[in-house]
């Protein structure tokens, strides 16, 4: 059978192992073909091809449910659930998503883009199944990295206390970070664990003993204790942990041995209780470059399949904001040993890999544990250290209570750098950094800031580290503007002080962060129409520069706010609240992301759809305030 002929995963039923292995090869070919052209997550999906095929051969996916953690590794799932012909559109506007999405396919049983959610969701489905008297299977597939998340451990703790709730958790261990996957002892123990006579022997003996007159009622409890002791001796160390938490442990299993996987999954399904199947896979399996560099090939932009090298852009781009941040923080750490960089499993993405490489003693990676990262930093700051927590905007949402309870209320000097703030592009709604302005500006004591360019980023970083309270600095994804940066001598900013970038008499534009450049371009378009705009770089949303803004508002009486964040409770709302508190009642046009989910597309495509391009914003301003229009076409000077 050809992969292209698969429209339903149940078509895998009855196929031989050799046929499944052939389909596995086709999945990898298609996976590599598309990701090398359009970009996407590469290594995770390549590592779970056999796991996916074997698991799905043991399930009836018209009824059974599988929850994939994060979704990085779900490309093979998409290819065998009717999306082969659409796979070319992966992560493109109006194409299929890079993650699981319930609205995209009824086989996507639970949407995800953040880690550690799968076991909770699958357990919830299992409980609902049992309440309704149904009998389908519920499976969660989670990676060893995601298992470091507290939510996953909370779910395991809960599931282990529901011994009569059938649930299979597949632990996809692709980093050997939990236990060694090879060795005669592991192979032997796994073979013993999967042996039906041993698996059910103690249960059978226990049932027989119950029927012995007089003594039958007393022995089972002792037998139960003996059975538990034998299990603790027989199971590898990591397995014992799961057994103590109430799971039956199976593994570790070779995640690329389809025959063994099928036997293991069938054995797991027969047990009507929580089961942990530990599967060891190789991230990037089948593509040597991805196997050799599992971090670098976790996700890739377009690349040459033959050489494995990224295809360079036809037009050189400036250095990214993330890299400028990483370079600057490294220089600060070289001068101050109290400054500590903290990340939650995103060293390369946030730019902290430079610190990790050069001054590892001033670098901490807590794993996928955002809540812990925040409170860890809070504790460090109590005793004189200067923690800088670099984290994606979308992931910091997971630690909202810690931001309030452990940092804000105690007014602790912790610096947060929110990477990927604003529109992020092809990763879609689970990864858009559109909410941080709203959810952070309500927290007491926090200072919130965003730079207009790379040089201002450096000044804001040193400002944050020197400030005696909590700060949050948001930076956008991607390249900077090409503004020159400094190697040292960064001048701190005065907290809450904005700046006038351009004088004007007709309308006041107050822009925040990445939208300052867009405001300048918009003002140029308005100038072509005979409209003079005054531009303020707000720099801060908490506190706002009232001394600068209010006099200009009273003078111009027409106000526009611009932000790359949600309008609900965002920067524009902060300006309106400030004006209301000062009894200023004038029209305000708030420009930003409306109350919608921003789907996957390129950032430029998303901005156009949201009305955030300079020409669209110029038209909005003209229409809102009935400003005089000239007949000349709007063009950028």
From Swiss-Prot:
Which Gene3D superfamilies does the record match to this protein? 3.40.50.920, 3.40.50.970
This chain's source organism reads Prochlorococcus marinus subsp. pastoris (strain CCMP1986 / NIES-2087 / MED4)
Q: What does this protein do?
A: Catalyzes the acyloin condensation reaction between C atoms 2 and 3 of pyruvate and glyceraldehyde 3-phosphate to yield 1-deoxy-D-xylulose-5-phosphate (DXP).
Which reactions are catalysed by this chain?
D-glyceraldehyde 3-phosphate + pyruvate + H(+) = 1-deoxy-D-xylulose 5-phosphate + CO2
SUPFAM superfamilies from the UniProt entry: Thiamin diphosphate-binding fold (THDP-binding), TK C-terminal domain-like
Binding positions for Mg(2+) per the UniProt entry: 144, 174
State the family named in the UniProt similarity comment for this chain: Belongs to the transketolase family. DXPS subfamily.
Q: How does it assemble?
A: Homodimer.
Name the GO cellular-component terms: cytosol
Q: Which UniProt keywords apply?
A: Isoprene biosynthesis, Magnesium, Metal-binding, Thiamine biosynthesis, Thiamine pyrophosphate, Transferase
* This protein's name: 1-deoxy-D-xylulose-5-phosphate synthase
Under which pathway is this protein filed?
Answer: Metabolic intermediate biosynthesis; 1-deoxy-D-xylulose 5-phosphate biosynthesis; 1-deoxy-D-xylulose 5-phosphate from D-glyceraldehyde 3-phosphate and pyruvate: step 1/1
User: What top-level class of enzyme does the UniProt entry assign?
Assistant: transferase
Q: Which residues bind thiamine diphosphate?
A: 72, 113-115, 145-146, 174, 287, 370
Please list the cofactors this protein needs.
Mg(2+); thiamine diphosphate
- List the EC numbers from the record: 2.2.1.7
Q: Which GO terms describe its molecular function?
A: 1-deoxy-D-xylulose-5-phosphate synthase activity; magnesium ion binding; thiamine pyrophosphate binding
Alphabetical list of InterPro entries matching this protein:
Dxylulose-5-P_synthase (IPR005477), THDP-binding (IPR029061), Transketo_C/PFOR_II (IPR009014), Transketolase-like_Pyr-bd (IPR005475), Transketolase_BS (IPR020826), Transketolase_C (IPR033248), Transketolase_CS (IPR049557)
What does the entry comment about cofactor binding? Binds 1 Mg(2+) ion per subunit.
């Amino acid at each position: 059978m050809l992969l292209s002929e698969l429209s339903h995963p149940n078509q895998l039923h009855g196929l031989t192992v050799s046929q499944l292995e052939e389909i596995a090869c086709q999945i990898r070919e298609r996976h590599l073909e598309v990701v090398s052209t359009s970009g996407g997550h590469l290594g995770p999906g390549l590592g779970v091809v056999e796991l996916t095929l074997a698991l799905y051969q043991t399930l009836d996916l018209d009824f059974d449910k599988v929850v994939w953690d994060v979704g990085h590794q779900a490309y093979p799932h998409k290819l065998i659930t009717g999306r082969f012909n659409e796979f070319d559109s992966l992560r493109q506007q109006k194409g299929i998503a890079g993650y699981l999405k319930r609205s995209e396919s009824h086989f996507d049983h639970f949407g995800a883009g953040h880690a550690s959610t799968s076991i909770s969701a699958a357990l919830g489905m299992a409980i609902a199944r049992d309440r309704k008297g149904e009998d389908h299977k519920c499976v969660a597939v989670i990676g060893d990295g995601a298992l470091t998340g507290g939510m996953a451990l909370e779910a395991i703790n809960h599931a282990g206390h529901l011994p009569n709730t059938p649930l299979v958790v597949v632990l996809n261990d692709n980093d050997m970070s939990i236990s060694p996957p090879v060795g005669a002892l592991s192979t032997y123990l796994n073979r013993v664990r999967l042996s039906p006579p041993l698996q059910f022997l103690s249960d059978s003996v226990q049932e027989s003993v119950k029927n012995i007159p007089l003594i039958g009622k007393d022995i089972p409890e002792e037998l139960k204790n003996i059975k538990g002791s034998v299990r603790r001796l027989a199971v590898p160390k990591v397995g014992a942990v799961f057994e103590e938490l109430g799971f039956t442990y199976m593994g570790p299993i070779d995640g690329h041995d389809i025959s063994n996987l099928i036997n293991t999954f069938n054995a797991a399904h027969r047990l009507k209780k929580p089961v942990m199947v530990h599967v060891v896979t190789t991230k990037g399996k089948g593509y040597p470059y991805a196997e050799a560099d599992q971090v670098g090939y976790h996700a890739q932009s377009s690349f040459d399949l033959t050489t494995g090298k990224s295809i360079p852009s036809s037009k050189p781009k400036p250095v990214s904001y993330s890299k400028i941040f990483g370079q600057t923080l490294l220089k600060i750490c070289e001068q101050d040993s109290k400054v500590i960089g903290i990340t939650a499993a995103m060293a390369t993405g946030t730019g902290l890999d430079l610190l990790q490489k050069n001054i590892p003693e001033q670098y901490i990676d807590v794993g996928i544990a955002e809540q812990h990262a925040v409170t860890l930093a809070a504790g460090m700051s109590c005793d004189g250290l200067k923690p800088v927590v670099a984290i994606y905007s979308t992931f910091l949402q997971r630690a909202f209570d810690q931001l309030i309870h452990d940092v804000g209320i105690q007014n602790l000097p912790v610096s947060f750098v929110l990477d990927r703030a604003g529109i992020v592009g092809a990763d879609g709604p689970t990864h858009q950094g559109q909410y941080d302005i709203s959810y952070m500006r309500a927290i007491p004591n926090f200072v919130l800031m965003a730079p207009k360019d790379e040089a201002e980023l450096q000044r804001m970083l040193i400002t944050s580290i020197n400030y005696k309270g909590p700060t949050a600095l948001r930076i956008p994804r991607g390249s900077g503007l090409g503004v020159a940066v400094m190697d040292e001598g960064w001048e701190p900013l005065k907290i809450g002080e904005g700046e006038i970038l351009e004088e004007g008499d007709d309308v006041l534009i107050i822009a925040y962060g990445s939208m300052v450049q867009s405001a300048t371009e918009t003002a140029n378009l308005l100038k072509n129409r005979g409209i003079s705009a005054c531009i303020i770089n707000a720099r801060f949303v908490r506190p706002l520069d009232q001394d600068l803004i209010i006099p200009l508002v009273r003078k111009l009486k027409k106000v526009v706010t611009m932000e790359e964040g949600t309008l609900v409770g965002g920067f524009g709302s902060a300006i309106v609240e400030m004006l209301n508190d000062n009894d200023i009642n004038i029209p305000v046009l708030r420009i930003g992301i409306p109350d919608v989910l921003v789907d996957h597309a390129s950032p430029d495509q998303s901005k156009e759809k949201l009305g955030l391009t300079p020409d669209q914003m110029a038209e909005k301003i003209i229409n809102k305030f009935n400003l005089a229009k000239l007949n000349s076409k709007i063009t950028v000077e």
